[in-house]
Amino acid sequence: MSEYLFTSESVSEGHPDKVADQVSDAILDAILAQDPKARVAAETLVNTGLCVLAGEITTTAQVDYIKVARETIKRIGYNSSELGFDANGCAVGVYYDQQSPDIAQGVNEGEGIDLNQGAGDQGLMFGYACDETPTLMPFAIYYSHRLMQRQSELRKDGRLPWLRPDAKAQLTVVYDSETGKVKRIDTVVLSTQHDPSIAYEELKNAVIEHIIKPVLPSELLTDETKYLINPTGRFVIGGPQGDCGLTGRKIIVDTYGGAAPHGGGAFSGKDPSKVDRSAAYACRYVAKNIVAAGLATQCQIQVSYAIGVAEPTSISIDTFGTGKISEEKLIALVREHFDLRPKGIVQMLDLLRPIYSKSAAYGHFGREEPEFTWERTDKAAALRAAAGL
């Protein structure tokens, strides 16, 4: 029987790029809490002893950006110079400008050529869902995120006190070529930052027994499963001391782990007028509801926009041969049941709220948090009825 392999990865909240994402989204949330109509594009750079805040922000909110950045870094766990990055001791520079008026007139409702709220930029976005996991996410990315959440949990509650914030996980999964179903887990790679005092064998055994095995489905772990734990043998220097971190560099981790295409636009630090973020969330909402409705077991949707124009310039759907109705009919249902104009998306998903910090680590999709409206399946019944199933 033929098989194929597929791999996805996740990173922890202490990974330098994720530190940057979380600072950017914490600043976005602090602004939206006071000014829901703010225009925010908050970028962050973190390096040894340094946090740089830059980008474009137009708002009436009064926010202590330096305080927000320090509190976020401290919450992640970088609270000591021994870790190479200290929330209280690092220098924080603030270099924000305002949104370009040329862009603003295309986004502000009633201005520009299109009197509806136009898209904040041109671009293409994808959404995806499949029936491999309970939250309709691909297997490898879903469980890679769960491994990283487990690492954080054991670090913060003190059960494995030698863990440090920076970590990465990677899963290679074996699929049956005929059924397309997961057969077993081939390889688990998990690298975690640690105190210098811990012996390698003790670390390896603890990671396998306390992080990996409680998370991954036991029936998919076999005698052939390979465990690669801190493969270099040592991971003491990490976080922003080990690598420079930037907002928006983990876009595949943030989405579907490579199981679906990506339009290229990052999420964190962007208010919902930026379709890079809001339309990608809407695409996930559409795809998840199509799969939840039983109209397909796998669904990928692409939408595209032009700056300053409200209506999408294209909508396309691929169900990879699993659809119960044609893709043309699915597109018609999407147009009928989902408003994919920027303002329609914001209203449909209630996005003008300070809900984004939680999304900045462990994936934007496949987590059924109460704030994550794009994970609801409240349109599934209507879609199924409209399809005549």
Swiss-Prot record:
It comes from the Bacteria. Its cofactor is Mg(2+); K(+). Its EC number is 2.5.1.6. It is found in: Cytoplasm. K(+) binds at E43. Binds 2 divalent ions per subunit. Binds 1 potassium ion per subunit. Residues 99-109 are annotated as: Flexible loop. GO terms for molecular function: ATP binding; magnesium ion binding; methionine adenosyltransferase activity. It catalyses: L-methionine + ATP + H2O = S-adenosyl-L-methionine + phosphate + diphosphate. L-methionine binds at E56, Q99, D243, K274. Keywords: ATP-binding, Cytoplasm, Magnesium, Metal-binding, Nucleotide-binding, One-carbon metabolism, Potassium, Transferase. Homotetramer; dimer of dimers. Belongs to the AdoMet synthase family. Catalyzes the formation of S-adenosylmethionine (AdoMet) from methionine and ATP. The overall synthetic reaction is composed of two sequential steps, AdoMet formation and the subsequent tripolyphosphate hydrolysis which occurs prior to release of AdoMet from the enzyme. This is S-adenosylmethionine synthase. It comes from Neisseria meningitidis serogroup B (strain ATCC BAA-335 / MC58). The lineage of its organism: Bacteria, Pseudomonadati, Pseudomonadota, Betaproteobacteria, Neisseriales.
